[in-house]
Amino acid sequence: MAKLAVTLTRSMIGRPENQRVTTRTLGLRKMHQTVVVPDNAAMRGMINHVSHLLTVKEIQE
């Protein structure tokens, strides 16, 4: 099963609360922090919601 490496590349300062909550739910707390998440519909939906703040790479295992 594929996984996604998600990196927070834009600051959370001045962002709406719903975007802050989404990034925290993805496990991202600091800029340039990278987390590995499973590639499923729920994660893809969260990533699409804040895609302008993230960099996403697919990881094959």
UniProtKB/Swiss-Prot annotation:
Source species, domain of life: Bacteria
For this chain's UniProt record, which GO biological process terms are given? translation
InterPro entries listed in its UniProt record: Ribo_uL30_ferredoxin-like_sf, Ribosomal_uL30_bac-type, Ribosomal_uL30_ferredoxin-like
Gene Ontology molecular-function annotations: structural constituent of ribosome
The UniProt keywords, alphabetically, are: Ribonucleoprotein, Ribosomal protein
CDD domains assigned to the protein according to its UniProt record, in alphabetical order: Ribosomal_L30
Annotated coiled-coil segments of the chain: none
Quick one: a GO cellular component term? cytosolic large ribosomal subunit
Instruction: Fetch the NCBIfam families from UniProt.
Output: rpmD_bact
Q: Which family does it belong to?
A: Belongs to the universal ribosomal protein uL30 family.
Tell me how this protein assembles: Part of the 50S ribosomal subunit.
Quote the protein name from its UniProt record: Large ribosomal subunit protein uL30
What is the organism field in this record? Exiguobacterium sibiricum (strain DSM 17290 / CCUG 55495 / CIP 109462 / JCM 13490 / 255-15)
